Design a protein with these regions (language model features):
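Charged, flexible cofactor/metal-binding loops and thiol motifs
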Residues: 56-117, 129-135
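Conserved ABC ATPase signature
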Residues: 268-272, 276
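Conserved ABC ATPase "signature" region
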Residues: 191-195, 246-263
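ABC ATPase NBD Q-loop/coupling interface
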Residues: 12, 184-206, 243
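Conserved catalytic motifs of ABC-family nucleotide-binding domains
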Residues: 289
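Hydrophobic anchor residue at the start of the ABC signature
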Residues: 6, 10, 282
């Protein structure tokens, strides 16, 4: 879950230590790129069972098991044709349930051509604390500098950059968790243009039903004192959506959508792995059926 530069440095350190100390390294990862660059012998597992094992060439050049073949097809390639989609490992059979029935349809004539979100010249700087003995003038760090973009409805936009380049800061400004120094954020609320930065606190609470956030860290973003059911349904309670029965059904449907066992709704976050916790965070963000979902590296 690191950016490529930091990841490469850590992997190089592991490789150097392995050589210096003449030891073996057992690496558990879901990243096939890391496996290809680091591993000599590979074991592919799924649900606690070994699907296939072998050397580097066997796994990457001559896969035998259907699951391993599906893994390779699901990895992005440079030779993908325009419009070509990756092949999912498993298709989720989703029947129309609570979420689809409760979703308010987008009016056909409501600003169909306008972008869902428009960001103009967004900037944010942070003050640097005075550290000199004589207390010189404090400096600034420009975290976001004049960023502009548009997101059409039904489209995805990816922001790419190394750690510390301002991706999370920008995301938090879109959600109004941080206030920008300059710029404008305009949201197309079914044809009505909303100045996000001008919303009052009361208006902002209602607005966040339309825009949700998936946090980068699945450990600190989940309340350890709350069971999964309460975590997923908390947004519904805050916004007064549904009754106990409908919220229970929504929680079950969301658990199925993110590939988690419905029987685990009463468990606490410490019972889950990092990847499972991230799925819980995704389920929570989807509970309100937002029109826009901001994902802060939800890997």
């Amino acid at each position: 879950a690191l950016d490529v530069t930091i990841q490469a440095q850590i992997l190089k350190l592991l490789r150097d230590l392995q050589g210096e100390l003449d030891m073996a390294v057992l690496m558990i990862t879901h990243d096939l790129g890391v496996v290809a660059n680091m591993a000599e012998n590979i074991v592919v597992m799924h649900h606690g069972e070994v699907m296939e094992s072998g050397g580097l060439n066997d796994i990457f050049r001559n896969p035998q098991h259907p699951y391993l073949k599906a893994l390779h097809k699901a990895v992005p390639r440079f030779d993908l044709a325009p419009g070509e989609r990756l092949v999912p490992i498993r298709e989720i059979e989703h029947h129309k349930g609570f979420l689809q029935e409760a979703k308010e349809p987008w009016p056909e004539t409501a600003g169909a051509e306008a972008p869902l979100l428009k960001v103009e010249n967004l900037s944010k700087a942070f003050q640097i604390r005075k550290s000199s003995l004589f207390g010189g003038a404090a400096g600034q760090v420009k975290a976001v500098d004049g960023v502009s973009f548009e997101i059409p409805r039904g489209e995805c936009l990816g922001l790419v950059g190394e750690s510390g380049c301002g991706k999370t800061t920008l995301s938090k400004m879109l959600m109004r968790a941080l206030s920008p120094d300059t710029g404008a954020v305009t949201y197309n609320d079914r044809g009505a243009l909303v100045d996000v930065l001008a919303l009052t606190q009361h208006e902002l609470t209602s607005f966040r039903r339309k825009m949700q956030f998936i946090f980068q860290d699945p450990f600190s973003s989940l309340n350890p004192r709350m069971p999964v059911f309460d975590i997923i349904t908390e947004p519904l309670v805050i916004h007064g959506i549904g009754d106990d029965d409908s919220r229970r059904e929504a929680a079950r449907e969301l658990m199925r959508l993110v590939g988690l066992d419905v029987r685990h709704l009463n468990r606490y976050p410490h019972s889950f792995s990092g990847g499972q916790r991230q799925r819980i965070g995704i389920a929570r963000a989807l509970a309100l059926q937002p029109d826009l979902l901001i994902c802060d590296e939800p890997v």
